[in-house]
């Protein structure tokens, strides 16, 4: 019976680890041509999709729903059907709303600091007279790793390949808004592709 008593605690100890693995969300988008909101320039196709609902957010971020906290994730898929490598390291993307206002993307590392509570640390301190160890700690709803791991990070895109990831905007989504993208270059010549202006169709 002793081996049995030793086995039970071991199973209990390992159970949380297995539970955590089950909660991991694997994300893979559909082929670029399957998205209604897309545009093709010079044999390069870009598709975009706003993740504004809880169901959509669940497929990419698990329990996290960024739009609930004022952050709109926009999935961007780039399909390179040219015979040249594309440089994406200077890609510029803006959200154009129904009023014509252009909103810059919020860097993934800055997203947690857009909600009330945490402040980005600075060399001069944060101005709060209460010592950090005495402050009441609140869990940041946007402080998990999903925001950064899902962010668009590709710097180069080989021929006949695709890259995808999320850009984050402090914007209110409406169908008819659009995504403006430029500064995609041909790596060999440095020539910039024509800009993309992609309206949301859903």
Pin down the residues of each PLM region.
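Sec-dependent signal peptide recognition
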Residues: 2-9
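Small side chains
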Residues: 9-10, 165
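Hydrophobic h-region of N-terminal signal peptides that target proteins for export
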Residues: 10-18
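Conserved functional micro-motifs across diverse proteins
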Residues: 19-202
